[in-house]
Amino acid sequence: MNPSFYPNQFDCIVVGAGHAGTEAAYISAKAGLKTLLITMNLDTIGQMSCNPAIGGIAKGHMVREVDALGGLMGRVIDQTGIQFKMLNTSKGPSVWAPRAQAEKKQYQLMIKHQLEKLQQLSIRQDTVEDLIVEGNQVTGVITGRGFTFYTNHVILTTGTFLSSVIHIGTYQKESGRIGEPTTKGLSHTLARFELRLGRLKTGTPARVHKNSINFDGLEIQDGDENPRPFSFSTKKIDRKQIPCFITYTNDTTHELIKQNLEYSPMYSGQIKSVGPRYCPSIEDKVVRFAERDRHQIFIEPEGYETNEMYLNGVSTSLPEEVQWKFLRSIKGLEQVELMRPGYAIEYDYVDPTELHPTLETKKVKGLYHAGQINGTTGYEEAAAQGLVAAYNVIRSVRKEEPILFKRSESYIGVLVDDLVYKGVEDPYRMFTSRAEYRLLLRQDNADQRLMQYGYEMGLVEESLYKDMKDRYARIESIKSHLFVSAMKPSPELTKVLEEKQITNYKFGHSLSSFLKRSDIKIKDLEPIVSELSILNEDEKAVLEMEVKYEGYLKRELETIEYRKKFLNFQIPIDFDYASVKGLKTEAIVKLEKHRPLNLENALHISGVDPSDVDLLLYHLVDRH
């Protein structure tokens, strides 16, 4: 029973304070909703349970999208990063991706500090053991210490803590992270509501002592000389950067692992759930990729003030003594000392096809799920979902229409669409290959694509929004100039042509056509086009990309318009899919299960291909 002075009525309650929960609570409270964040330990708010890094391929795109929408992750990593790197710069701009190593503890403390500053946010250390539901509407939560808090909107962000078990060899313990308790009450609650539960597995590598590593002869991986921020509000990164190191497994390592596979919970049958396909354990790598004579390991620092080092690439649940043995067979780690062992963890998740695209459950109104409870893996995927859930809670409280992010405008849209329509068979990780329109969904233009949503919701400052509009107005102005202005002879141009060994150049072509040449970069135009001086380096990079890839961008936009024209065609909720001649049996079963609202949603259901959607389109048009 709550004391009379204890506030117990909230607009939104967020359960769990990992990367989904902190983003959800931040967005909700920032928008003015009276919000309660409940976490089992205040000291682990925003904790990096696995790798001490933010961003990466496609993940960095999502961090920038979260930032453009008013979120927290990008700003905090800019303030706490210890190495910044733009990945994939040797490839096309659609797959360039920012990544940063974090000062792990400082990142966590900064997240907590940002939450504590919000006037509309209350933070409580407790667990949630049950939900109060009247009819099919959530009305509150009951905590482990017996308190009741009331709300019509609950966001569950329980991470890996639902009925979780950790495994190290034959050792098993009910735990959400090593040394932390599990929670079972909510698993029973969700089952009671007939939400489909499943089991997934993830893992983490050992943490080792820096002073026990011999760095001589290891490959050094430095950060970028001129690091680019994640947040559009960060003007410059001026933090001291420290290197990572690279080493490799070898035949001896692999043999030691093979000799001890019977003690691996994954191979002994002790673990029956499915692990992440794209982040396999070292045991899996050795077995599945037996033809490889080595596997790469990144030795990553966890901060300036700690000697803990993270061994990226050797996630394992082998017995602790085996971990010592195989790690000491690796170059640079011959005398390594483990500070924390690697381990695997099994946990409950809820089938995400139980959710609407708002991340609200279909069976319980006002109940939203975000993060690993939806079968995803990764801090960035979690943060994106926390933001989506919070955006839609805000819309609900304000009695406004929900916000549905489209695949054509964001990786966040791709993520949610994949989850709620295709579901997951193993922990879901975002890749650029999952996005059909990835040339439009670049990391550099996330603000142009999404910031208006955040501004209209009151989550992005007017000054930041105005800066964005001014930025793209400048870029568009120069781009128009390049397309309408012809190349003319000049001493500056002659010098560029000589340096590039370009002969017999025909004048009269546009400046844009000159820039489209593979041997010409935007910097080559600077002596010729004085107007470029009004752009900063990032703006010039955007301009160059939009000119060079103009044809591809135009084609993607045309494809989007075509789909808008036809794929938004509504499907009646009681539509008889079996009546469509030629539709595959698998497609009929999947369509009847998911009941998509329109043809675009139908296209994104696993087991339904474009030819099935074409048949549906013809049938629906004939009916009308």
Swiss-Prot record:
From the UniProt record, list the coiled-coil ranges.
Answer: none
- This protein's GO CC annotations: cytosol
In the record, biological process GO terms are: tRNA methylation; tRNA wobble uridine modification
Positions annotated to bind FAD? 16-21, 128, 183, 372
Which sites bind NAD(+)?
275-289
Q: Which domain of life is it from?
A: Bacteria
Which terms are listed as keywords in the entry? Answer: Cytoplasm, FAD, Flavoprotein, NAD, tRNA processing
Q: What are the names of the required cofactors?
A: FAD
User: Where is it predominantly found?
Assistant: cytoplasm
Q: Where in the cell is it found?
A: Cytoplasm
A GO molecular-function term, please? flavin adenine dinucleotide binding
Task: Give one Pfam family.
Answer: GIDA_C_1st
The record's note on quaternary structure and interaction partners says:
Homodimer. Heterotetramer of two MnmE and two MnmG subunits.
Assigned protein family? Belongs to the MnmG family.
Q: Write down the PANTHER family for this protein, in alphabetical order.
A: GLUCOSE INHIBITED DIVISION PROTEIN A, PROTEIN MTO1 HOMOLOG, MITOCHONDRIAL
Q: What does this protein do?
A: NAD-binding protein involved in the addition of a carboxymethylaminomethyl (cmnm) group at the wobble position (U34) of certain tRNAs, forming tRNA-cmnm(5)s(2)U34.
Please state what the protein is called.
tRNA uridine 5-carboxymethylaminomethyl modification enzyme MnmG
Record gene name: mnmG
